[in-house]
Amino acid sequence: MVFAFLVFLVALVGAGALAVVHIARASANVVYADTWGHINMVGHFLSGRLFPAELFAPHNQNRPVVLNIILLLSAKYDHLNLIHVEYLSVIFAILTVVIIVYFCRQMFEGNYPLMFIILSVATLLMLSLSQWENFLLPINIVFFSTITFSVGSILLLHRHLLRDASNGLSVDFFGAILLSALALFSMGGGILTPVVNTIQIALSWFLFRKQVRTTIVVYVIVAGLLTFIYLKSLGQSIDYNYDLTHLAEMSQFILAGLGNSTVGFFNNASILQLDIIFGIFLSAMYVFAGVKFFRLPRPEQEQSLGVFCLLLLGIFEQMLIGLGRLHLGVGNAASSRYATLTMISVVAALILLSTYTRGSRIYAALAILLGGGICSFAILADYEEAKMETARMQYAQNLQRILRGGQITEADKANLEWDNLEDIVSGNEVLKQHGLSLYDEKSNPSR
């Protein structure tokens, strides 16, 4: 057990350190892309003119309250050092791994060597640089926070449902509600956390005859209210007519997205066909894991319900991404930002398959096959992304030069990745006025 634990510790610390080093080598303290949509709010806050409603303002069909709070705190206490915000993304990823370890240890029934080896593989995936876009764009911290809060909520609710008196309310239950709210107000993908939790409560009643009337009534009411607040005046981002008339493309999009959660980029580009092929393989693993779950003895099934719901979460996230992004083309499924939301299914399937291995060579072989695929692609993704560090740093430093030059033109919008020139110009003035981000002397002493 000691050796297996050391392997896990090395994987966790090593993968986390690699992500931190990659950020330090590939990113600069500069505002670009969707971050521009939040800078005027930061200026209002520092000038004492912030309206509370601005925290809840829609942004790209999301209501990122958690992100807004992080940016305001960073501006107040850290001069909006966006590199540090990116480091916080790594902390969220590590926290997700720790949550899974803590809540899933009972599933392995004392087989700690197996548990630590399996979770070492999962760690390599969850901290893989296949998510480079989320590690290197500060506001994409919402992808990591959404998954952290969602996983915590689902597993807390599972522990509540394991109690003999699960019809009552507990600290775990209220913790699950709180984390559901944080996931929801991180980004749009968090809307699936209440959905999965409701399914979890319903399965607990249907499979185990748990008395969950109070639990489901209170949860649905609170989650429904939070969802209503979130969706109010948000605007529709899903073209259902288009999606329903392009079902073949939708299936390709979903398969490519599932595969993309593990495969990563090669020479700074995705290989769509490889994503689809691996997506088919992962889909088969999910089917094996799901079918076996419903055939488990009741005690094992009850212990595994939380992880089974994590499997559903990642699949549902990919389906939601497909509904909202299919009109952009099947290739959009291979965007590295989405991998953070969907890889939780891969981790859940690996855990489930590994716990099925007792007395079953078939599931042992499937677990080894899946684990081997995860390790191979995680290592390749890290290697491929490490080759891009110099180019990405040069790109970020070029953005700094554009902003410091002061004469920002229409032609610069493409480089700064934001369509509204007024946002960029006014935001740049906010940064200058308050000494934020690239204009902070302490974090940019060489400028």
Enumerate the language-model features and the residues they cover.
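Aromatic- and kink-enriched transmembrane "portal" helix at the membrane-lumen/periplasm boundary
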Residues: 116-148
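Transmembrane alpha-helix segments characteristic
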Residues: 117-126, 220-228, 298-325
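Specific aromatic-rich, kink-prone transmembrane helix
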Residues: 121, 140-165, 345-348
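Membrane-interface alpha helices of multi-pass inner-membrane proteins
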Residues: 170-199
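Hydrophobic/aromatic-rich transmembrane helices and adjacent perimembrane loops
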Residues: 135, 142-145, 331-353
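Extracytoplasmic catalytic-loop and juxtamembrane helix elements of membrane-embedded
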Residues: 28-48, 137-140, 230-257, 306, ...
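Intrinsically disordered, polar/acidic, low-complexity terminal segments
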Residues: 2-66, 71, 75-119, 170, ...
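Hydrophobic transmembrane alpha-helices of multi-pass, membrane-embedded glycosylation machinery
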Residues: 191-208, 224-227, 353, 358
